[in-house]
Amino acid sequence: MAEERQQRGRDRDRNREEKIDDGMIEKLVAVNRVSKTVKGGRQFTFTALTVVGDGEGKVGFGYGKAREVPVAIQKSMEQARKNLVSVDLNNGTLWHTIKDGHGAARVFMQPASEGTGVIAGGAMRAVLEAVGVKNVLAKATGSRNPINLVRATVKGLSAAQSPARIAAKRGKKVEELNHG
């Protein structure tokens, strides 16, 4: 029943998902109307925040501005495809707990067991689903500004490292990490 209910207002376009022929998952996070007052009246422009991912560890976000919504979305999708970063995943979840932030937005992400699902809100959910995380517990604190939440989430995910990468950095084997 909840799925059948139509969303109203600005939530209507939030987290809209499309799969394009290149296999990338595109999610529209937010569309905003901006007004500039000039001598002849108001000029309206639109901004779009989108997230693009391959569902297997790559994710990027883009922010586009234009006089019309479709053009703003297209610009932001192009920018998102140019800004892809790699994320180390562990069977559909994270390797370890992640805390990060951008501006006043703070994010906390924790690995979860199989069957948990993506427990995250708003802009964080779009990023986590696009990158291919299937099970995670996440919480946003501080500012809920979608742009800063997306930036903080991508920054935290890209800083996360697998045990194999940490061991290679230290010149050790993975088995030696916990023992000394």
Curated annotation (Swiss-Prot):
Role, per record: With S4 and S12 plays an important role in translational accuracy. Located at the back of the 30S subunit body where it stabilizes the conformation of the head with respect to the body.
Q: Which family does it belong to?
A: Belongs to the universal ribosomal protein uS5 family.
- Highest taxon, organism lineage: Bacteria
Residue stretches making up the S5 DRBM domain: 24-87
Quote the protein name from its UniProt record: Small ribosomal subunit protein uS5
Q: Does the keyword Ribonucleoprotein apply?
A: yes
- Residue ranges annotated as coiled coil are none
The UniProt entry's GO biological process terms, in alphabetical order, are:
translation
Instruction: Please name the PROSITE patterns in this protein's record.
Output: RIBOSOMAL_S5, S5_DSRBD
Q: How does it assemble?
A: Part of the 30S ribosomal subunit. Contacts proteins S4 and S8.
Pfam families, A to Z = Ribosomal_S5 (PF00333), Ribosomal_S5_C (PF03719)
The GO terms this record gives for MF are: rRNA binding; structural constituent of ribosome
Q: Does the keyword Isomerase apply?
A: no
Domain comment, in the record's words?
A: The N-terminal domain interacts with the head of the 30S subunit; the C-terminal domain interacts with the body and contacts protein S4. The interaction surface between S4 and S5 is involved in control of translational fidelity.
Q: Provide this UniProt record's keywords sorted from A to Z.
A: Ribonucleoprotein, Ribosomal protein, RNA-binding, rRNA-binding
GO CC entries: small ribosomal subunit
